[in-house]
C-alpha cells in the first residue's frame, strides 16, 4: 500500500515552493503519493490574527534570507519574486476547477513562473501563458473561477 502525504500549498508561498522541490527529490522513486491541497495563505494569516511577513520589514528580510539558505542548501533553483506578495485567489481557484489530468502541470508551471522565473502570475497576460503552456481552455478557466475576462 502506497503511503500518501497531504501537501498544503499556496503558489505565493516561497516555503510551499521550496518544500515541494524537496519532496520531489525525496520522492523520485515514487515511494509515496503527494495529495495536493490548495489553501489561501493570506486567509490563514487573517484567521490566526498574524501579520504576514510580507507586511513586516524585519520578517520579510528574515524570510528572504531563510529562503535563500534553504534553496542553496538543497540546491533548489529559486529567485525571489519582485511582485511578492500577489493575490493568488484566482490561480488557487483555477487549480480546483481544472481537469484532474492537467493539475500537476498547472501546479508545476505556476510555481516555476513565480519562484524560478520571477514572473507576475497575477497578471492576466501571464495567466494566459500558463494556460496555453498547460493546454487549458482559457474561456472555461476564467468562467469557472468567476473572473469572466
Question: What are these language model-derived features?
Answer:
Residues 2-6, 15-32, 100-105, 109-149:
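C-terminal cap of thioredoxin/glutaredoxin-like
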Residues 17-117:
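Structural alpha/beta surface segment adjacent to cysteine/selenocysteine redox centers
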Residues 10:
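Residues immediately within or flanking Cys/His clusters that coordinate Zn2+
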